[in-house]
Design a protein with these regions (language model features):
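Histidine-centered active-site microenvironments of extracellular/periplasmic hydrolases
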Residues: 51-56, 60-62, 98-151, 163
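Loop/turn elements at helix/coil->beta-strand transitions in domains of secreted/extracellular proteins
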Residues: 35-41, 105-111, 199-201, 216-219
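Beta-strand elements within well-structured catalytic alpha/beta cores of enzymes
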Residues: 39-44, 86-89, 93-96, 110-115, ...
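Formylglycine-dependent
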Residues: 1-39, 45-54, 68, 72-74, ...
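A long, amphipathic alpha-helix that forms part
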Residues: 25-32, 65-108
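Extracytoplasmic
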Residues: 248, 252-428
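C-terminal cap/loop subdomain of S1 sulfatases and analogous C-terminal strand-loop tails that border
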Residues: 119-124, 132-135, 156, 160-232, ...
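A short beta-strand-to-alpha-helix junction
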Residues: 14-24, 76-91, 105, 129-144, ...
Length: 428
């Protein structure tokens, strides 16, 4: 059954209007208010997270009163900014709910609120062990709220552990959709009517950076195979391997089986190719974030997200992506760049298999970096700048997998472009 509008990938990056969380909220509200049929809206707030930018009206009203177990490592200004971001999220979630109420959609709308991982800094975290990047509770346990005024009783606290993988099958189940698919997750619908029901056989695995933990409803076995009783020791301070040996052996076997079943078939060194010419998509974005490069080229930050590639001083160096063209077809290519005035006339070449196109970059564009003025503390991510878009040309992609290369074929001056993004638009 079809229920929802489909929003396709946009042709080009868009410039937002004000603080990003406010802007995302306003755009989401506009979409929902103008939806006459049932809709699904995924509102992906990117806070609290660095860079620590938040409006003064929220930042100045925050006092940091709670300290976590790693208080000696805490940056109070960063914590203040993070808490201000949470206040801003709360404000914007309120706007969404008020809009649903105003438009008589609230009672029959399922609203889910949750986060992706633990805090990205050392701050109060319910005394749980560690933070984002850890497979202990402090790194992976997050709040989860669900409401459906028309169907779910308010005030329930579900005791059963669940995973983000459970959200999709649960929504399918709640809406009584028929599905013959085998999901990785498990529907939690039954717990919403019986919140004290427990499945003692359910286990959740967390894997990050070669560290693996597994937990059931009462215990966690961490990456060092230390067992903790989470009902009585949420902070994971006292291993209980000997006291609860049967629980230890059960979780250890589950962990070993999972490693053999999943990790043994997982090769982190093999990166999947980026797909082009997919039947259901007109546009493909290939950002610097996902590119590889050679020679003296560098990334603007060790953190790839929203970075750009710079220090292009040699015709021998190039930027590349492993690309799988699912079908043969022509693509219109757009490129986002900056270039100093002294390098005007630099020629770029883009090639895939036996096909290539060239472009002389005649218009210099060399803006300054942005972002530092609004940061509450010095960021670890890349600063950004206003990259210029040009039409590069039309490139034919043969069906198959190969390397897409962006080269400086003629360097004028001492420095080629700083590169941010390629956009491919399927034209046939």
């Amino acid at each position: 059954m079809s229920c929802c509008k489909t929003i396709k990938l946009v042709k080009s990056p868009v410039r937002g209007d004000g603080y990003i969380i406010d802007d995302i909220t306003n755009k989401s509200i506009s979409f929902m208010e103008n939806s006459d049929s049932p809709f699904f809206t995924l509102i992906t707030y990117n806070t609290p997270h660095s860079p620590m930018q938040v409006p003064d009206s929220f930042f100045e009203n925050i006092e940091v009163n709670l300290q976590g177990r790693y208080a000696d490592k805490e940056n109070k200004i960063k914590t203040q900014a993070a808490l201000a971001m949470v206040e801003n999220i709360d404000y914007n979630v309120g706007k969404v709910i008020n809009s649903l109420k105003k438009n008589n959609k609230y009672e029959n709308t399922i609203i889910i609120f949750f986060s992706d991982n633990g805090p990205n800094g050392n701050r109060w975290n319910l005394e749980m062990k560690e933070r984002k990047g850890s497979t202990n509770e402090g790194g992976v346990r997050v709040p989860f709220f669900i409401q459906w005024p028309k169907k779910i009783k308010s005030g329930l606290v579900v005791e059963q552990i669940t995973s983000v993988m459970d959200v999709f099958p649960s929504l399918i189940d709640l809406m009584n959709f028929d599905s013959k698919n085998n999901f990785d997750g498990i529907s939690f619908k039954k717990y919403l009517s019986n919140p004290t029901l427990i499945d003692n056989d359910r286990k959740i695995f967390s894997y990050w950076g070669q560290r693996i933990s597994v937990r059931d409803n009462n215990f966690i076995l961490d990456h060092n195979d230390s067992l903790y009783d989470l009902k009585n020791d949420l902070s994971q301070t006292k291993p209980v391997n000997n006291k609860f040996s049967s629980n230890y052996l059960s979780l250890k076997k589950s962990k070993d089986d999972w490693i053999n079943d999943v990790i043994s078939n997982y090769d982190n060194s093999q990166r999947r190719a980026f797909t082009v010419n997919y039947d259901e998509s007109t546009y493909t974005h290939l950002p610097a974030r996902d590119a590889d490069f050679t020679g003296d080229l560098t990334r603007s930050s060790i953190h790839a997200n929203d970075s750009f590639i710079e220090n292009w001083t040699s015709e021998e160096d190039y930027i590349y992506w492993n690309v799988n063209s699912l079908n043969s077809g022509m693509n219109k290519v757009s490129l986002y760049y900056t270039l100093p005035e002294t390098s005007s006339g630099t020629q770029l070449t883009l090639e895939f298999m036996d096909n290539k196109i060239k472009k002389d970059i005649m218009i210099p564009h060399n803006p300054t970096l942005e972002g530092m003025k609004e940061d509450r503390i010095k960021r670890i991510e890349s600063y950004t700048k206003d990259f210029k878009k040009i039409t590069f040309g039309d490139l034919f992609f043969e069906k198959g997998e190969s390397i897409l290369k962006l080269k400086t074929s003629k360097l004028k001056g001492k420095k080629s472009i700083d590169f941010w993004l390629l956009v491919l638009e399927k034209t046939e």
